[in-house]
């Protein structure tokens, strides 16, 4: 739909009747004459539909109705004046004269007077660009009941724009179902009318969301088929099983603050909480016996010895010493290892790869531990000191001694049961 240029941008909508005219037609203006000279006439718009204007905001144009006594008031240039806002006049908007011989006004005189009488137009069309606006000139008896001197619009209750062709390219507000032809006007409408611009609304509770993802996540709370997992020891409810399992660990751990009865997954988190939230009752002395020398809690203990670990994976790797399990095997020589790091370092003996280089000389090494030993031995005067406490070192030595004794007992037991295998 083509845009109409106006003097006042506030008048956004004009109603038109689209008339298809071919170039070979003899006349593009439909004129009918009547001999009803003295009856006042008015204007009425027929077959209206919405017209899109440059700024895209739709408003109804108010048109001034006038009472004209005769058709002498119709000039060749001035046709209709619209409430002082703009006028259809001049060469931009003018009546197209009829050039057809069949449509020329008759020059014969009135039988009663013998002279040619001025006749009011019964219908005329105004062409704007390639569009034709058609107006109907009616008599006072055919005019609406409203007084002609009022400033009301001629068009009462115009039909809304609902055709897909008319709605193409418009911006639709999801809150109030209003259409806009300009993006800036649409965004300003969202901010001024609907507040914080949350177009997505939950049909269950009325909550609004800024994006569809948030609304979809919210709709899960209304689902009747949503699984619920409740804790067996407290009234808390969880929507996921893993959340419930993680919560259960807090009931079985000893990491509980006795001041506020809060649960913590680790002993370190509990001590940090006590030092910050309850500094008056916090004991900053040596850690209890169930803590490792590095300050971490000893949550896992070996099934074969009394050695304790903070992480479960460290305990599993340690137990391979007792079981003799070596799950990692080399693809070159089929040699097996208990740890993946040992296998990686062994494979480099086959590939001759030396990824770790010394920054002070040109020597390179297979792993980082060899590089560290080289730096301490060749480039520093300090002796190699292992970062481990004396008490922890003695504990490890005792555990290794017990492991050797247990292994010797197992070998003797096997020898007694199978004496011929030795």
UniProtKB/Swiss-Prot annotation:
Its subcellular locations are: Nucleus
Give an example GO molecular function. Answer: RNA polymerase II cis-regulatory region sequence-specific DNA binding
Lineage, top-rank taxon, reads Eukaryota
Q: Where is the composition biased (Low complexity)?
A: 99-113
State the UniProt keywords alphabetically: DNA-binding, Metal-binding, Nucleus, Repeat, Transcription, Transcription regulation, Zinc, Zinc-finger
Q: In which tissues is it expressed?
A: Expressed in vulval cells and all somatic gonad structures such as spermatheca, sheath cells, uterine cells and distal tip cells.
Give start-end positions of each zinc finger (C2H2-type).
Answer: 171-194, 200-222, 229-251, 255-278, 300-322, 328-350, 356-379
Q: Which BP terms does GO give this entry?
A: regulation of transcription by RNA polymerase II
Q: Which Pfam families match?
A: zf-C2H2
GO CC annotation: nucleus
Q: Where is this region: Disordered?
A: 95-119
The entry summarizes the disruption phenotype as follows: No visible phenotype. Double knockout with lin-35 results in sterility, defects in gonad migration and vulval morphology.
Tell me the function of this protein: Probable zinc finger transcription factor that acts as a transcriptional repressor. Acts redundantly with the transcriptional repressor lin-35 to control the development of somatic gonad lineages. May, in addition, suppress sensitivity to RNAi.
What this protein is called in its record is Zinc finger protein zfp-2
Species this protein is from: Caenorhabditis elegans
Q: Which gene encodes it?
A: zfp-2
């Amino acid at each position: 739909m083509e845009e109409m240029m106006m003097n006042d941008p506030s008048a956004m909508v004009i109603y038109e009747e689209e008339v298809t005219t071919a170039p070979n037609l003899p006349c593009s203006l439909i004129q009918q004459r009547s001999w009803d000279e003295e009856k006042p006439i008015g204007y009425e718009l027929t077959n209206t539909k919405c017209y899109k204007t440059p700024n895209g905001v739709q408003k109804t144009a108010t048109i001034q109705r006038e009472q004209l006594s005769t058709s002498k008031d119709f000039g060749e240039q001035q046709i209709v004046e619209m409430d002082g806002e703009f006028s259809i006049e001049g060469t931009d908007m003018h009546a197209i004269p009829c050039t057809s011989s069949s449509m020329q006004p008759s020059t014969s005189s009135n039988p009663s007077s013998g002279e040619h009488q001025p006749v009011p137009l019964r219908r005329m069309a105004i062409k704007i660009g390639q569009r034709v606006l058609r107006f109907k000139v009616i008599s006072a008896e055919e005019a609406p009941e409203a007084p002609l001197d009022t400033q009301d619009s001629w068009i009462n209750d115009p039909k809304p724009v609902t055709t897909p062709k008319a709605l193409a390219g418009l911006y639709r507000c999801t809150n109030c179902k209003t259409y806009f032809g300009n993006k800036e006007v649409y965004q300003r409408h969202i901010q001024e009318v609907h507040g914080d611009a949350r177009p997505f609304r939950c049909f269950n509770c009325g909550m609004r969301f800024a994006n569809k993802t948030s609304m979809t996540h919210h709709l899960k709370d209304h689902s009747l088929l949503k699984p619920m997992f409740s804790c067996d020891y407290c009234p808390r409810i969880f929507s996921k099983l893993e959340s419930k399992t993680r919560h259960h660990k807090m009931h079985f751990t000893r990491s509980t603050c006795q001041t506020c009865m809060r649960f913590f997954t680790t002993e370190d988190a509990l001590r940090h909480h006590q030092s910050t939230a309850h500094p008056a009752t916090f004991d900053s002395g040596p850690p209890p016996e169930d803590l490792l020398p590095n300050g971490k809690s000893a949550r896992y203990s070996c099934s074969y010895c009394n050695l304790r670990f903070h992480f479960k994976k460290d305990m599993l790797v340690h137990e391979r010493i007792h079981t003799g399990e070596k799950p990692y095997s080399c693809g070159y020589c089929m040699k097996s290892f208990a740890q993946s790091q040992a296998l990686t370092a062994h494979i480099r003996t086959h590939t001759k790869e030396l990824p770790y280089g010394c920054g002070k000389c040109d020597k390179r090494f297979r792993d980082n531990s060899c590089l560290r030993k080289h730096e301490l031995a060749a480039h520093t005067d300090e002796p190699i000191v292992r970062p481990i406490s004396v008490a922890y070192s003695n504990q490890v030595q005792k555990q290794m001694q017990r492991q050797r004794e247990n292994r010797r007992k197992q070998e003797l037991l096997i020898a007694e049961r199978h004496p011929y295998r030795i």
